[in-house]
Amino acid sequence: MSQDIQTQNSYSDELYSSQIYSTQQPQQPQQQPQQQQSTFSSQQSQSSSYDFIYSTPQIHSQNSQNSQFSQNPLYDDFIHSTQNSYSQRVSSQRSYSQKSSSSQISFSQIPSSQIQSSQIPSSQIHSSQIPSSQNQSSQKSQFSFSQIPSSQIPSSQKRFFQSQNDDFVPSSQVTSLQDICLPQPIQQQQQQQQQQQQQQQQQQQQQQQQQQQQQQQQCQPQQQQTQQQQQQQQQQQQQQQQQQQQQQQQQQTQQQQQQPQEDDDDYDDYDGYDNYEDFVYNEGEEGEEDYEDYEQENDDDDDEDEDDDDDDDDDDDDEEEEEESQQQHIRSRALQSRSSQSRPLLRSGFKSPISRLSQTKTSPEYIYISSQSNTHTNQLGQSSQQTNSPNVHFNSLQQKKKQQQQQQQQQQQQQQQQQQQQQQQQQQQSQQIIGSQSSQSSQLPPTQPPVEVPVNLGRLIPINASHIPINLNLKREDRIVVGRSSSCDARLIDNYLTISGKHCEIYRADNLTCLKHIPLCKDKTDCHKNFGMLIVHDISSNGSYINGELIGNGKTRILRSDDILSLGHPSGDLKFIFESEFQFNFILDIKDNVNNLNENLDYKKLRTAYDNARIENKNCALRDYYFVKEIGSGGYGIVYEGLYKLNGKRVAIKHIDLLKNGSTSKSMELVSKEYNALKNIKHRNVIEFFDIVFSSTDCFFIVELATNDLSNLLRKRCVDEDDIKRICKQLLLGFNYLHNLGIVHRDLKPENILYNEFKQGFSIKITDFGLSSFVEESQYLQTFCGTPLFFAPEVIANNFFSNGYGKSCDLWSIGVTLYLSLCKYKPFIVDCRDLYHSFINGNLGFTSKKWAKISNYAKDLVRRLLVIDPEHRITIKEALNHPWFTQDRRFFKKYPKHYKSRAQPKTQFFVECFNVYYDLKSETGFICFREHFDNLETNYALFKQNFDNNNNNNNNNNNNNNNNNNNNNNNNNINNNNNNINNNNINNNNNNNNNNNNNTNTNNINNNNNNYNNSHNHNNNNHNHNHNLNNHNHNNNHHHNHNHNHNHNHNHNHNHNHNHNHNHNHNNHNNNNNNNNNNNNNNNNNNNNNNNNNNNNNNNNNNNNNNNNYYNNNINNINNNINNNINNNNNYHQQYTQHTTM
């Protein structure tokens, strides 16, 4: 330690002798210690009265000839007091002292004789450094800077002097030190700035209010209420702003009152020193120990600060390290000088308050402080009053100012956000007002179309290493031309000249020319199904090959991943393997043994069916298609999604197993003829047929693809009435086209109605028509078991009795589909008999809430489509002209307001078929149904025989009447009687008159004839009456047993009449003979004739009784059979209900 002190002393002596030299200064008169004490105390009191923001260097003025400042007892007391105060406050102020150690310096007791003016720049000498001994006239520190050249004053400091000349500052304009050192208070500036900002905001608000008022004046008087609300909101806003301003002013006044008190306390703690480092340097060994403790605390705090400031920039860290190195260097030099001299070495690069403002950097120059000098005089010959500089307090003030600024910024941001919210609310209100006036809002189209980016689909890797790979980065409409020409995108070199100038073109498969006429879909996934696939278009003369198969000039072919493209020859050198960026594992190659379609799919059956079709058909169309995946299955077979190899078009391939559906060779011939006609079908609302492939066991139909069906649309989305109207009209147009070709669907339901959705609406496609010819009638019923809702009544009746049905059965299915689409529930529940019968009888109810929004036109069309009798059902042409589509009220007047489809006599049989068919639910139910239906069929046969017998009896009666008329022609009297027979119901009185005019010989005969005529006419009436009743009862025979017995009685009467007529004809023959005898015999024969007539009547009665007994026996047998059938039917119902409940 001693060696270090000696080296420090030697170095300080050399530095002292080289840098310090004497200067001639005027001597000052000596001052007594009392006077010095008084001046010191006055200076101390004076310094406490000022609140300086920036620190100033201190110089103690003393007499250099008579006394030394270090021997003054007042100074020693002051040092001890300040040392104690600093030790208490060092922990709170050490952060600032570390930064200010490199820039602050103390000029205490520097004798004026030893300091040259050229060594101290004028910018670093402050008014507080000038001794105050030469100017005792003024109590305040008033001095003049008239002799300071303006060149030595920095530019940032000139604004404090307000000089009139460029060279010197007149002393008349400088009154005090406070006027020079202190700038305008920052808080006042901030207040002014805030006031200006508030004024600007108020002006902006006023302008906005004026604009809104102008807009509202143009609106209707309805806006008056909204204007009043806006005015109230504006008033509330202004009141809030005023309250905020008052609060801010109160806070500012409180801060101004608190700050001077805090500053005075800080001044009292360390009067006489600029910072803690000056205090340590000017003290002895005690100060050195304090300084070491202070360094240790600084190091601990620095470690904590480093943890907190990890997010700071690297530049700030570098600057801090440089400052710390400089500080350590200065401290080491100062400690070296302290061992040899009584005053430490200080850095002359101390920054004054004004130099801090300008942030000027000075070179590290060093001076010594002499221990012998007691006074210091300046070149100006003026003294300055000693002041205290609160350097530590400066940092705290800056922190407070920063906090205030942050608070003010936050408040301003909050105000701006509130204003923006209010403006948005006002704009929304104004837009609502304007929108109520205009019904349509103007929407601008997009200014620029979206920019398409090329997609990397893969590359063509050559097998021969001499060729270059071809990268396939393509847009949708791009084409890569491959060939030998220089204009080709991919130029190839061929020594054998097998490559054409333009050999082939490669483009994306989702840019098909055949699909350009189709508008863009809303759901663009359907348009991009072929995304990632390529098409090769052969335009060469020698040909292009894919996997060894020739494409052909002008033809195209899909290029899949790992396919080999050969140019010129299949075994040539120019071969490329297509390495795709998209792996298409979903494409099934029938030649492979891998099933990647569906795990549950029987792949062997599909493969065998495919092989059989290719063997039996030389030009099999299935070779041109890929099987992609399974998309559906049903009673007919399985449906696959296919891909056309030539152009990548998507199709649907339907596979039907003919052996499973029970088809024969004859039916296949009929089907082939039918589907050859279907190939020519081309309508926008009907699925298009592309090709049909037959084999002995299977059949493949290649048709247009449409994956969405109407059932999913109605289940997932809410479709309005206008869209349903378009769908229904397209259905009617499609069926009108099919019916004109003689094609009947008979199995229409929402699952068979496919659609594609476009921007303009829905495009409907009718599918699965004509496929029922592949299935037998029994299989047809089993296949569609449980879906009688969409079957027309005549279709079900045709399956039972083969009575035939017409084209109107499809209209029934359209009506049920329309009903379901409008209200989203079925028109009737098949399991509920009451509701089912009410629907069948024509009682359609539209009482649900969902029907309240449906128009009357739609309801009327549903009523006309759902009519039981097909003859009274609306036709397609009438439906297309319905007012629901035409919206013509004149046409609607032709229809009745309340239309009810009453069940006609013909439709009663259809109702019977529906009552039986609703029990058909499963295979077991179908077997029971067949037994039940056989009983029904036998009953129907019995009734049909009775119906035929009645018709035959009517014919016999007519013949007998004709014979009577011919026999009566032989006699004039009988002719008269026959005339009476023909007109008996109308002219009975005339007949009586004619009888009186006849001879007395024939009166009895005439009377008998008259009686016969009456009875005959009566019998004819009875016969006609019975015939009508028979028909009525025959239709209701299966329902009511009582009616069946009633029918039995009527049949008895009918047979009685028939026998009576037959006997009566015989009597007429006798009468004719009697009449002839009357012409030749006497009047006595009349009695004989009367007796004969009576006998004949008796015989007739006997015969009638015998016939009645015979017929009664027959009817009893029939009744027994029918009762047995009814009992069997009841037992079937009981068994079936028990089976279903279990």
From Swiss-Prot:
What SUPFAM superfamilies has UniProt attached to this entry? Protein kinase-like (PK-like) (SSF56112), SMAD/FHA domain (SSF49879)
Q: Which parts of the sequence bind ATP?
A: I631, G632, S633, G634, G635, Y636, G637, I638, V639, K654
SMART domains noted in UniProt: FHA (SM00240), S_TKc (SM00220)
- Composition bias (Low complexity) maps to 17-72, 83-157, 187-260, 333-348, 432-443, 949-1034, 1068-1133
Q: Which InterPro entries match?
A: Atg1-like, FHA_dom, Kinase-like_dom_sf, Prot_kinase_dom, Protein_kinase_ATP_BS, Ser/Thr_kinase_AS, SMAD_FHA_dom_sf
In which residue ranges is the amino acid composition biased (Acidic residues)? 261-277, 283-325
Q: Where is the composition biased (Polar residues)?
A: 1-16, 158-178, 374-397
Q: Where is the composition biased (Basic residues)?
A: 1035-1067
**Top-level EC class as recorded in UniProt:** transferase
Q: Where is this region: Disordered?
A: 1-359, 374-404, 432-451, 947-1142
Q: Tell me if Coiled coil is a UniProt keyword of this record.
A: yes
GO molecular function terms attached to this record? ATP binding; protein serine kinase activity; protein serine/threonine kinase activity
Q: Name one GO biological process term.
A: regulation of autophagy
| GO-annotated cellular components | cytoplasm; nucleus
UniProt xrefs under CDD domains: STKc_CAMK (cd05117)
What catalytic reaction does the record list? L-seryl-[protein] + ATP = O-phospho-L-seryl-[protein] + ADP + H(+); L-threonyl-[protein] + ATP = O-phospho-L-threonyl-[protein] + ADP + H(+)
Q: Its family?
A: Belongs to the protein kinase superfamily. CAMK Ser/Thr protein kinase family. CHK2 subfamily.
Q: What is this protein called?
A: Probable serine/threonine-protein kinase fhkB
Question: Which gene name does the record give?
Answer: fhkB
